[in-house]
Amino acid sequence: MDTASASPAAAAPSPQRVACADALDRQERLYRAAFGKSDGERVLPWRYERSPHGASITLLTCEGEEPVAAYACNARRVCSAGGAAVPVGETGDVMTHPEHRGRGLFLTLDRQAMEEARGEGWPVVIGLPNSKSADIFTTKLGWEAVGSIRPWTFVLTAGAQARAARRRAGRLASIAVPWTAWRGSMRRGALRKRFFGKINAVAIPRFTEKADALFEEVRGRWPWIQERSAAFLNWRFVEAPSKRFRAHGVYAPDGSLRGYAVVQLPERGESVGWVVDLLAADEVAFAGAMEAALGHLQKVGAAVARATAVEGSWWERQLRASGFRAPASGDRKRIIAHVLEPGHALAQAVRRPADWYFTDADRDDEVCS
């Protein structure tokens, strides 16, 4: 969740709900000013308009023709225990022009965004705010802190780049890199033994209806899982503006897709790759997908692979069992929720994120960092 300033202050001009196509120029100017990023012209339409889960709620506050603040709440389709997909919200870009911070613009925007979400029939909205704004959400705006996510790390090599990456978890973690790399290679060997001769992992340029069939098979296992249709996966990864994602499919001898993994390639000159999504029908397919992901990242020169998991979740347990190492105790980001329809089944599920199926694919950010 990109959040640029959330400081309360004096009354603010009223925000207006806008369509991205009608306000792209103003949104792009504000995006550049708030975040210092120059890719808004291609990122914002992709993010706000093109998701097969639905268009985002986008609010814009202007003084005259000048944009001073904006708020995006992205549509997500969530399935619960095999039921029909339900539209919910996930907060996205929340931005205030640097010259207009401290005026309460964010507070007004959030309140209106929640009313717009209620009007859309979304029973809940979730968010992953930065540390500066998390307390404002929960103390002033009616949000609840429901859990946290943490970044786990798999050490692929034992060199200086891996030691530098593990320093984030502390000095001892950095010193232990040779042992951690050896332990990781042992875990990868166990993964290969689990799937050897049973499935075949190959790179896939685009997801097909086989991904739809896989999702239908597994979606009933969790009380909260965002819909992973082929259309969504292609939008989220294949058509993403960064072009930094690569997918591998895991196939049974009969040609059915039993699992897949998606990795995010390291930024040029960097050594950190990411396992951003993985879905598997069983333990054999999981092993094949995870090894395909780690092998791809090592092949392109990554020293470590990272993956974010909800604390206490199935995905966190799988990462640990696969050889990923825990972060420093304080290295976490809060998950917050705003319940708009208390009687809805998802109002209960949203308060138990440890039961979710949630990977980096489910975050609002296009790329992990």
Over which residues does each language-model region extend?
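Short helix-adjacent coil turns
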Residues: 22-23, 104, 301
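A broad, structural surface signal
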Residues: 25, 29-32, 111, 115, ...
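Conserved N-terminal entry element of GNAT/NAT acetyltransferase domains
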Residues: 1-22, 183-208
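A conserved beta-strand-loop-helix scaffold within acyl/acetyltransferase catalytic domains
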Residues: 15-98, 131-132, 201-281
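Secondary-structure boundary elements
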Residues: 115-123, 251, 255
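Active-site/acyl-donor-binding loops of N-acyltransferases
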Residues: 2-6, 75, 123-181, 236-239, ...
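Conserved acetyl-CoA-binding loop-helix of GNAT-fold acetyltransferases
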Residues: 96, 101-117, 127, 283-296
